[in-house]
Amino acid sequence: MPRPTKFRRVEFFPENNYFVPWGKPKCEMHEVVLKVEELEAMRLKDIEELNQEQCAEKMEISRQTFQNIIDSARKKVAIALTEGKAIKISGGHYTTKLCKLKCIDCGEIYEINYEQDRHLCPNCGSEKVICNKKADFCRRWCKGQNRKEQYEESKNK
């Protein structure tokens, strides 16, 4: 069974997410879809001028995965520029905020995107999970979530 795809950490979101060649009619327009993490990889490497290892660390992925992402991004941009295609920045497998959780029942430690995911252990399905890493960006959310759960439990008793 293949491993699940890790979320790629992204810090930048463009104001404009659609770029078109000048003077080309819409009916003739084809587009290339550039994923958000592909844009982030190009930004870190080409604008911030970080080395591959630093870029991979910032995105919380391996160097090989970073290289695959940036190769794909550069190819898409080159195709769009040479063939006169529009570039649409959309989709991907990314997050801005991750939280490590630990299942009390089975001991599994896993990461979630706390803005989207639910508090269910992917291993056993238990709802008895706690924050395993008190990171600055999720501390208040985790504490608030725990208080909410405690309140609901006391209400049900």
Swiss-Prot record:
Species: Clostridium botulinum (strain Loch Maree / Type A3)
UniProt-listed SUPFAM superfamilies: Sigma3 and sigma4 domains of RNA polymerase sigma factors
Classification via Pfam families: DUF134
InterPro entries in the cross-refs: RNA_pol_sigma_r3/r4-like (IPR013324), UPF0251 (IPR002852)
Family affiliation: Belongs to the UPF0251 family.
UniProt-recorded name of the protein: UPF0251 protein CLK_0815
